[in-house]
């Protein structure tokens, strides 16, 4: 079995033994095949059997990832499969590509509603029940309804009663106008049954079965038995399809100590069409997380906001509803309702959230194993420390340290260092890297603290060699693996190797390194910007200088050191101010520069 198939098989071992749908993806993230299963783990495992067809083997050779959506029943899985195939039209799906759909029961919105089977939804106020994947079951139940209840069978009015009236299967509404109340009661009973309340009808069938068996009419008894079975099967609530002309999202958040898993189940025209999964490491409490996520998710530029957003707990959403509606110029609702259908949908979302978390952790573990192999490490890079350097034209140089554990940020391990080895205006990333690596790992050694498994430097060969020389000086180069990742080319450099490693963009090991590198870069720039803003705010301490003019001083004149290189006339000319104000700025810069030297503060 090829390596990628071995990896997939390990992923499948985590799948639940419940019903649902699975989507098979190619390396370029294209959906190749969509299927459904009563038992997801067992069904997907079958694709790895030696007895599979030649075509299936070709499919599996191209599959790099499998995503699943769990459902509450096999019926729901089948319906969802149909909807997904229609939406994505995968290469290897053929039989379900037709747009025929599954039949439903329609109760028309006429004065005397008719009840019949249909595959087409008309938005005219009619009520729909289903869809039903077993057409035979549906036909048997419809036949039972038509014989049990006296409903209208014909479309046109007549002066005389129809044949069904004479058979006792119609009240005679085709020729009488005074039966509205009586007819409404018949319809309400039918709706009651189609909503799953079948105990009375089942009891009636049991009595009827005993009667025909007593008369030795075994053929009728068999048909009644089949009808009973069909009635039980179609009474199962089909929550995959909600028959209304709305777009609705159902939001659920599964919180753990280290990670929040957010699931959005998306319904279009009453059909579940997609799920969207997000992982979040924020420290928000649940109520605040719901509010923050909804705000960010639905106000993003390309997001199509549904008619309704269902949430899993009651919170005040008036402000975020108003915000979304105003920004998007729409009218959406954010609602919480404890209806039977909503509870079942949220249960499905819960199941998918928990499963997504398992899959996420599995993928992270797989990426860490992949990284170990690529970097030829002796042990797994469970703990990675990443470094980056930032400065303002050679001033205020800082280094950031971020820590990742098992591919996830570990905020307690974040640090920022002010670089002291560079003079103001000096730009030397290699020298800055040497300082921060020396300070960091000298401290860990002296305090006998645990070393990381891997160090990542944001940069190229030069920065890597600088960091590696410090590790050698500390005699820990054999204890810690180290690499560098160049920004534009995304090439991985290793010590003592001339050629860098170029990985595919979707390679999980590269993605781990990119996440660490980008976080270190973000952290360094944020802190550097903070220092930059502090300088700007300091200028406002000069009498007569407001925030706008302070911003201009920083932009035109630069840092305190830059100002010291100018005389008062040059300052006045550049800033277009009088000589008195120029003297104040010059004097303030001299004072601040002296304070910084005394405090050893950059």
UniProtKB/Swiss-Prot annotation:
| Residues of the GIY-YIG domain | 17-94
Which residues are in the UVR domain? 199-234
**A GO term for molecular function:** DNA binding
Q: Which InterPro entries match?
A: GIY-YIG_endonuc, GIY-YIG_endonuc_sf, GIY-YIG_UvrC_Cho, RuvA_2-like, UvrABC_protein_C, UvrC, UvrC_RNase_H_dom, UvrC_RNase_H_dom_sf
Q: Which UniProt keywords apply?
A: Cytoplasm, DNA damage, DNA excision, DNA repair, Excision nuclease, SOS response
Q: Name one GO biological process term.
A: nucleotide-excision repair
Q: Which domain of life is it from?
A: Bacteria
* SMART domains linked: GIYc
Q: Where in the cell is it found?
A: Cytoplasm
Q: Which NCBIfam families does UniProt cross-reference here?
A: PRK14670.1, uvrC
UniProt family annotation:
Belongs to the UvrC family.
What this chain does, per the record? The UvrABC repair system catalyzes the recognition and processing of DNA lesions. UvrC both incises the 5' and 3' sides of the lesion. The N-terminal half is responsible for the 3' incision and the C-terminal half is responsible for the 5' incision.
Subunit and partners? Interacts with UvrB in an incision complex.
Q: Which protein, by its recorded name, is this?
A: UvrABC system protein C
């Amino acid at each position: 079995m090829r390596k990628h198939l071995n990896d997939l098989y390990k992923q499948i071992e985590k799948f639940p033994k419940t019903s649902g749908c699975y989507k098979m993806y190619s390396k370029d993230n294209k959906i190749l095949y969509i299927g459904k299963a009563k038992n997801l783990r067992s069904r997907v495992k079958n694709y790895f059997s030696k007895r599979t067809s030649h075509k299936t083997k070709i499919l599996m050779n191209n599959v790099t990832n499998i995503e699943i959506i769990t459902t509450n029943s096999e019926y729901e899985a089948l319906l969802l499969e149909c909807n997904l195939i229609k939406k994505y039209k995968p290469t290897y799906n053929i039989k379900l590509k037709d747009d025929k759909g599954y039949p439903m029961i329609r109760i028309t919105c006429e004065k005397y509603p008719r009840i019949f089977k249909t595959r087409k939804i008309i938005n005219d106020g009619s009520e729909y029940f289903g869809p039903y994947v077993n057409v035979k079951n549906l036909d048997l139940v419809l036949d039972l309804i038509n014989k049990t209840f006296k409903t209208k069978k014909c479309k046109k009015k007549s002066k005389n009663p129809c044949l069904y009236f004479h058979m006792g299967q119609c009240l005679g509404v085709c020729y009488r106008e005074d039966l509205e109340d009586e007819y409404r009661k018949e319809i309400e009973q039918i709706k009651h049954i189609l909503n799953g309340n079948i105990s009375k009808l089942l009891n009636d069938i049991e009595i009827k079965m005993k009667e025909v068996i007593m008369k030795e009419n075994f053929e009728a008894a068999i048909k009644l038995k089949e009808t009973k079975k069909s009635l039980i099967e179609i009474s199962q609530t089909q929550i995959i399809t909600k028959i209304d002309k709305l777009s609705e999202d159902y939001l659920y958040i599964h919180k753990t100590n280290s990670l929040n898993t957010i699931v959005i189940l998306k319904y279009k025209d009453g059909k579940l069409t997609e799920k969207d999964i997000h992982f979040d490491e924020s420290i928000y409490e649940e109520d605040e997380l719901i509010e923050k996520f909804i705000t960010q998710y639905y106000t993003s530029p390309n997001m199509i906001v549904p008619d309704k957003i269902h949430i899993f707990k009651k919170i005040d959403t008036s402000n975020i509803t108003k915000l979304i509606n105003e920004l998007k110029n729409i009218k959406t609702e954010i609602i919480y309702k404890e209806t039977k259908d909503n509870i079942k949908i949220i249960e499905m979302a819960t199941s998918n959230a928990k499963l997504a978390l398992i899959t996420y952790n599995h993928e992270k573990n797989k990426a860490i194993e992949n990284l170990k192999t690529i970097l030829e490490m002796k042990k797994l890079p469970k703990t990675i420390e990443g470094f980056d350097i930032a400065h303002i034209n050679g001033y205020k140089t800082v280094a950031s340290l971020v820590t990742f554990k098992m591919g996830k940020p570990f905020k307690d391990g974040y640090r920022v260092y002010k670089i002291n080895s560079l003079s103001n205006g000096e730009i030397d990333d290699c020298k800055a890297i040497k300082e921060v690596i020396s300070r960091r790992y000298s401290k860990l050694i002296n305090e006998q603290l645990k070393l990381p498994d891997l160090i990542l430097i944001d940069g190229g060969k030069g920065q890597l060699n600088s960091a590696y020389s410090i590790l050698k000086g500390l005699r820990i180069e054999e204890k810690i693996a180290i690499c560098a990742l160049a920004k534009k080319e995304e090439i991985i450099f290793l010590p003592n190797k001339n050629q860098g490693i170029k990985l595919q963009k979707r390679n999980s090991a590269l993605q781990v390194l990119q996440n660490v590198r980008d976080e270190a870069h973000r952290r360094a720039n944020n802190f550097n910007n903070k220092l930059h803003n502090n300088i700007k705010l300091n200028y406002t301490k000069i009498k007569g200088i407001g925030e706008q003019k302070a911003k201009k001083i920083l932009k035109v004149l630069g840092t305190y050191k830059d100002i010291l290189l100018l005389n008062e006339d040059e300052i006045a000319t550049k800033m277009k101010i009088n000589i008195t104000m120029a003297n104040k700025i010059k004097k303030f810069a001299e004072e601040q520069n002296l304070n910084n030297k005394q405090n050893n503060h950059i």
